[in-house]
Amino acid sequence: MSDALNKFSMPMFNDFVPEKIRPWIYLFIAMCFQLSGARYLGPLNEIIGDCGYMREDILMCMYCNLAGMAMWFPMLFRMKFRFSNKTLLTASSITVIVTNILTAHITFLPLLWLLCVIEGIAKIQGTFECMSNIQLWMTPKRDMKVFFPILHTVILSAICFQDILSSFFGHIGDWVLMHYLIIGLQCVVLAILTTCVHHFKFTNQPLLGVDWTGMLLWGALMAQLAFLLDYGNHYDWFNGSVIWYVSGFAVITLAMILWRMNNNRHPYISPRVFTSFRFVKPILVLIIIYEAVMGTEYVLEEVFLEECLDYDTWTNARLVWPVWVGNIAGCAVSFVWMRLVNRFTYVRLGILGTCFLGLYVVTMYFLVTPALNMEALWLPLFFRGAAYSCLSIMFMVSLHDSMDFQHFFQGLSIFNMLHMVIGGCIGCAFYTEGLNHYAAEAVRNFLITDSKTIMCLSVKTLYGWVAFVCAALLIGFMMFDSPIRRDRKMWRF
């Protein structure tokens, strides 16, 4: 029975499609979904200039898109067991097409944010349908130490290519072309689904016991927290009434979530996710810290490249290539580390990822000068890419091994809320406030008037503080993995 379940096949394909290319077709479709988005950050300055947005408005679109992906994780298997693979992929593809058409022309922000959430849901559902159907092709034993590195290779490659393509279209004069490219790719996906795939499903489980209200509350809480952290500096934090109102709504939303979590028979996120698994809470705390540190990419790095070095959009996009190489290297190292070298633990992979992150931060600290060749940035950006992939894979595999299957996707939802949305928002808010503080201090104490020098000093100072955080994380990991701790007996009270 177990051999039959673990035998790889793709019965949803029509007979004329060769079996050897079937998984590659689904890998292509997964890449098409991962390339999609609702607002593309590559041509950020061009979008701001054309639409009259603030930088915070575009970042909020990204956070809403990520929030839609994160909050949908508990529904992935429920939808898989309710609808056929072709139905879900077709619906996801059509949704991506419609949202890309609308977001290319809509400027009303609340509606734009809602469309970003919907696109995120379609994106993750389509990707999951493809990757879950070819999992046995990647690893016949469903070994997550194999699957997660391959999955991150696909996802991180798509993120890098999306940034490069959208920046190129912005560079040649029309950022909307990226939307048309995604629409064209999804039309190809629909053509493949129409001609090569038929409806097939093992079971037909009704969508009973789904806490839809709970799902909406979790999504609302993420949007409120992202708004607070994204727009906090713009509205002068708690000196303005807007932040007070949103904070009040966030507290009310959190209270409603906790009430439903403890009183609903089938809550969207079970309280057992937080109480019944030993390592879940440390993993969630650590991912917030690491994502806050990685937020340097969106604030310090962008300020340095644009304000200090005067790089344009296309020059910045060319710097994505060393990041992509680092991503691939990090995935390869993680695969070898966890799969082939069994004596190395996840904690030691975390130490390696933290070393990569520390090397990125320290190298950037010494490179922050008003005059710098672009080639000098390749090495630190490689380190950043390797650090991100190593740490993401390590945390995800650790979470998988810490939880049972019933609660894993709920835990994965919380993990990605913090990983993709909240952690990065906290980091960006901290760095934005830090830049303002140190820029004002440079003018006040050192009487510096040159804007490039002021920004370089501010960025350099913040990179220095982040280096101390990386050192503290590295020491913490090494102490956790020390022989005296691993070999001592557990206390008995």
Regions found by a protein language model. Give the residues of each.
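Hydrophobic transmembrane-helix bundles of small-molecule transporters
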Residues: H171-L284
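Helix-breaking motifs and short loop linkers at transmembrane-helix boundaries and internal kinks
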Residues: G52, S84, L102-L111, D310, ...
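Helix-to-loop junctions at the C-terminal end of transmembrane segments
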Residues: M71-N85, G170, G330-Y346
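12-transmembrane solute porter fold
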Residues: K20-S36, L41, Y268-Y438, L462-A471, ...
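Transmembrane-helix exit segments and adjacent C-terminal regions of multi-pass membrane proteins
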Residues: S2-K7, P11-M12, I448-F493
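Residue-level signature of mid-helix packing/kink "hotspots" within the transmembrane helices
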Residues: A38, L66-P74, I159-C160, W324-A332
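Extracytoplasmic
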Residues: L5-F8, V17-L76, G126-T127, M131, ...
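Helix-loop-helix hairpins in multi-pass membrane proteins, especially solute transporters
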Residues: L76-W212
